[in-house]
A protein has these predicted regions:
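Gly/Ser-rich helix-loop-strand patches that form or flank binding pockets
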Residues: 1-6, 83-150, 154-157
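Short beta-strand elements at the ligand-binding edges of bilobed clamshell
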Residues: 6-12
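Generic hydrophobic alpha-helical scaffold/packing signal
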Residues: 8, 25, 55-63, 71, ...
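A structural signal for isolated positions on well-ordered beta-strands in alpha/beta enzyme cores
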Residues: 8, 34-38, 71, 121
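Short beta-strand/turn micro-motifs composed of small residues
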Residues: 11, 39-41, 96, 124
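Short, flexible loop segments at the rims of nucleotide/cofactor-binding pockets, characterized by
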Residues: 13, 69-74, 98-99
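Redox- and metal-dependent alpha/beta enzyme cores, enriched for Fe-S-associated oxidoreductases
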Residues: 13-66
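Charged docking surfaces used in two-component/phosphorelay signaling
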Residues: 74-80
Length: 157
């Protein structure tokens, strides 16, 4: 049974965003619903291109790894676009900023959290590689962990 209310995830391609879409995709699959990926529209004044290529790549990876079809949607930058696009969401899954330890969740995420009608889950990446993210996004934590493991292994005799 497919529910009409999607899991919604804003996506900008940052490390924690990849973890958020992976978790959101698995939630959507288990709940029998769809996944809506949000990316920003172009801003000609600042020379910023839209996120359509990024959303297409993420959508393809989600489809290949998790097996669900995503709904990419371009929205205006800022919290208002996220809130409007998530108005019918079953759940909102949001990756934290790379600066979350120093700055907290940030102004936009805070505004989305206050205005969201659906349950909201903030996600950060862990030390384990993800199945959805492209190989070049392997984190420094994973490399550090692998290095420590190699250094502590005892030679076999």
């Amino acid at each position: 049974m497919i529910f009409q209310t999607p899991i919604v995830t804003p996506f900008g391609g940052a490390e924690h965003d990849w973890s958020a879409i992976e978790l959101a995709a698995w939630l959507a699959l288990s709940l029998g619903t769809t996944l809506r990926l949000l990316g920003t529209e172009a801003d000609p004044a600042s020379g910023r291109r839209d996120a359509s290529r990024l959303l297409a790549r993420a959508s393809l990876l989600v489809q290949q790894v998790v097996g669900i079809v995503t709904e990419p949607l371009l929205i205006p930058p800022g919290d208002a676009g996220d809130v409007e696009a998530a108005a019918d969401a079953r759940m909102l899954v949001v990756g934290l900023s790379e600066r979350w330890r120093e700055e907290g969740i940030g102004a936009v995420r805070g505004a989305v959290g206050r205005a969201a009608r659906a349950p909201l889950l903030f996600v950060r990446s862990g030390s384990h590689p993800r199945g959805v993210s492209p190989p070049q996004t392997m984190t420094r934590f994973t490399w550090t962990q692998a290095t420590r493991h190699a250094q502590t292994r005892q030679p076999t005799r």
